[in-house]
């Protein structure tokens, strides 16, 4: 059975790669990163001045951020869970190795790790 997750938005030459811990089931169901209403990513992005005009959460906006603003998206662990606390230590170890290879391969100018405790 194929694991449900979100696709990476990675390519050479990105200005920023936003790295989440892992996709939530909510985001996977909706098909885009940071999909949960009230996610702090969107107000922070809009306040940053990186995108003008302000954007609202959607799959199309994720693609716009990738194509127009050279902002990519990936996760430390690709296994979707209701909460990041449900990840096992093995998910983090495996994810760190894979993420390191992605960052070396795509070499973004900035890699931004996003996590909430």
Locate each region found by the language model:
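A polyanion-binding, active-site-adjacent surface
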Residues: 1-110, 117
